């Protein structure tokens, strides 16, 4: 058991050390919410050394943008979205 735990932590360490940046799409595009997300991204970067690019996406455009990005092989690392997208995106292989 101890060997498994050590292996898991070592894997996580080496996986995270190769990440230089994260792309984050958010539908929380209101100025106050964007400012808070930017602050959280800066805090995360200061603690991990991993930069976060916060990209606002209007909720009405999210489905089309995600589908196009998936087709182009250029999805972001993280998408903040509503539950309505979970099943169709899972079926399409986006999630």
Question: Which ranges hold each PLM region?
Answer:
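Extracellular glycan-interacting surfaces
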Residues: 10
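Conserved N-terminal structural module of periplasmic/extracytoplasmic solute-binding proteins
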Residues: 4-7, 17-94
């Amino acid at each position: 058991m101890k060997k498994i735990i050590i292996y898991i932590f070592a894997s996580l360490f080496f996986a995270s050390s190769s990440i230089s940046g994260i792309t984050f799409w958010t539908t929380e595009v209101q100025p106050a919410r964007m400012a808070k997300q930017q602050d959280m991204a800066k805090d995360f970067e200061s603690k991990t050394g991993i930069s976060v690019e916060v990209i606002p996406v209007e909720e009405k455009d999210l489905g089309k943008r995600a589908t196009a990005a998936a087709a182009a092989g250029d999805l972001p690392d993280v998408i903040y979205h509503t539950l309505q997208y979970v099943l169709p995106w899972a079926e399409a292989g986006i999630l």
